[in-house]
Amino acid sequence: MIINKEIDLGQGKIISIETGKMAKQADGAVVVRQGDTMVIATVVSSKKTPPPNQDYFPLQVEYREKYSAAGKFPGGFFKRESRPSEKEILSARLIDRALRPLFPDGYLYETQIIVTVISSDQINDADVLGGLAASCAIMVSDIPFQNPMSEVRVGRINGLFVVNPDINELVNSDLDICIGGTENTICMLEGEMKEISEAEMLDAIKFGHAAIRKLCALQSEIAAEVAKPIRPFTPTVIPAELTETVRVLCETRLKELAYTPLKKEERADQTAAIYHEIIESTIEHFKATCSSEEFSTDPAKALCINPHIIDEQIHMVEKRVMRHMILDDAKRLDGRALDQVRPISIELGIIPRAHGSALFTRGETQALVTITLGTKKDAQSVDNLTSSADKKFYLHYNFPPFCVGETGRLGSIGRREIGHGNLAERSIKMVAPTEEEFPYTIRIVSDILESNGSSSMASVCGGTLALMDGGVPIKKPVSGIAMGLIKEGASYAVLSDILGNEDHLGDMDFKVSGTRDGITACQMDIKIDGLDYHILETALEQARRGRLHILGEMEKAIPSTRQELANFAPKLTSIKVPVDCIGMIIGKGGETIRSITEETGAEINIDDDGTITIACSTSEGTNAALATIKNLTAKPEVGNIYIGKVRDIRDELGAFVEFLPKTDGLVHISEISSERVTKVSDHLKIGEKVRVKLVDVRKDSRTGKTRFALSIKAAEQDAPKENGAENK
């Protein structure tokens, strides 16, 4: 049965959802369309029973953009799509983060969601359509799922909110935020803004949620028509006696540990010791009270001596203890108040050869951030279905295993690192100078050296400081903070600057960055249902206060951007030449421009309009390259004196001298010296440099060629001219 339904979200944004035609062997498949952009989402969940010791949900979300969707060919030798691009990874993360909390507890079957863009009108982005399609594919399947989820993008143009703005509308929008949610709550946020207020942010979320409710209702309607029975699954039931035994053995010890402020490593060591002891004590307890026959015949009894199950029960006690400590006593693991930011230390310029650097430490989270300034040639190429451009401002985030005291392999960058780097980049991008203000390509690299929560926000702070240290004229400094939430029933507590444990054991991770005047980026993930707008408003206001506190600490370290670039940063000089001179500067096969680069050490970039940018770390190299280019493009002027090179000698006629690049003139034998010259080779040698004066320019009526008459004698008689035409 093919079902096709359409919904109008207003403002001409019409979305259609179809199921039952494509990919019918998947557990669920849906095609979503807006304009001529179409995505197909499929979901398959294994029916194979998970291993007994598995304690996680193996959900894999993949998002792929086919070049054929936009009538394009992939690059490379094989001309086919390969590993996912950064855009595809970020889109997959948007979908994964919104869907994952909505699967029922205890559902541990391997599940794979694949979202493929099959048509692109290159105007409507497919990422939020992919989130809608993925949720609807699950809804029409037999996979257990709590509630439909929808994603929308919200923009604001001239003060009016727009749902799912296209790329042309986003150019004029002062915010770009992706919102994922169910009919009752918001579960995911991510976006960038041009310094909007907390109230405006809340209004944007409410506007987006109204559209989400409509899309969720449509999904429920489609699922009801498909009417596929939900497959049965039985989550592992933990025996009450095991739960109680573990609680009695560990609750007091874990509570004492929770109320003792400790560093991350000390807490981890002591917690691990408690886990080890309690697991052994629990197994000994049940082995002493039950027979071996009971363990082999009663699955519930077997769970009581399973180390993985016992470990999970200890974790539940630890989580409950920490949450009640925060809710009942307003006390945190490190002893801080709920809205208190950890101590901050800042060092600037600690990497001598970098073009700007900062070491930002907040508690036990530390980021070493450097900037590198380059030319257009250093821009990052971006090629996807909706755009092909060069990024001149980008941030790379690295999270090596040693920053959390672990070993691990170093290789390709993971999805988490790409996501964190993208958030930090979007946070700072809003205050970066325009190309007209600062023609450099800017690369920021954040290396996390220590991590105990909020390393992406440390990258925002460190990135801002490194830019200011490097003399990059940013509009305003930006800081970031990660907020957390503990919620039990009607009671809740919002936490500022969360630790890793508070993130892991809490209900929300809400990162907010911005200037003193407003928010520039945000990212939120929610693990619970029922987040109301009052809590969100509280979190935004508390984040604002924390952000301003951090900005105050940053401004103490560096009140304003340095007035000069770093010593080793390239110095850029621009010159504009006639377009018809570009070929002369490049030379045959790039020979001329390559020789200039080799001789001067300068990097040269030429635009199609004749703008030439020279980048060099020394003023000498810059001046030498500039002089060479001026000489290459100079027009011969009668009366100017040049330094030329003898190219050919005709003893009875004179000498041919190259006085400008690729431009020769004749020094007649009578113009070589004031004295009589009978043989030119007695006075000049091939390759010799001589000072000549251009005395006449004539066009040969027979050949049409321009002929230049030079004089060494006249140049010697004239005083040396210090002007731009003279080749010194």
UniProtKB/Swiss-Prot annotation:
Protein residues bound to Mg(2+): 503, 509
Residue ranges annotated for the KH domain, each copy included: 570-629
Biological processes annotated in GO: mRNA catabolic process; RNA processing
InterPro entries assigned: ExoRNase_PH_dom1 (IPR001247), ExoRNase_PH_dom2 (IPR015847), ExoRNase_PH_dom2_sf (IPR036345), KH_dom (IPR004087), KH_dom_type_1 (IPR004088), KH_dom_type_1_sf (IPR036612), NA-bd_OB-fold (IPR012340), PNPase (IPR012162)
Pfam families listed in its UniProt record: KH_1, PNPase, RNase_PH, RNase_PH_C, S1
SUPFAM superfamilies: Eukaryotic type KH-domain (KH-domain type I), Nucleic acid-binding proteins, Ribonuclease PH domain 2-like, Ribosomal protein S5 domain 2-like
Keywords tagged on the record: Cytoplasm, Magnesium, Metal-binding, Nucleotidyltransferase, RNA-binding, Transferase
GO molecular function: 3'-5'-RNA exonuclease activity; magnesium ion binding; polyribonucleotide nucleotidyltransferase activity; RNA binding
EC annotation from Swiss-Prot or TrEMBL: 2.7.7.8
Catalytic activity: RNA(n+1) + phosphate = RNA(n) + a ribonucleoside 5'-diphosphate
Enzyme class: transferase
S1 motif domain span: 639-713
GO CC terms of this entry: cytosol
Main location as per UniProt: cytoplasm
Localization, UniProt: Cytoplasm
Required cofactor(s): Mg(2+)
HAMAP family per the UniProt record, alphabetical: PNPase (MF_01595)
Family statement drawn from the similarity comment of this UniProt entry: Belongs to the polyribonucleotide nucleotidyltransferase family.
NCBIfam families, per database record: polynuc_phos (TIGR03591), PRK11824.1 (NF008805)
Listed name of the protein: Polyribonucleotide nucleotidyltransferase
Species of origin: Pelodictyon phaeoclathratiforme (strain DSM 5477 / BU-1)
Gene from which the chain derives: pnp
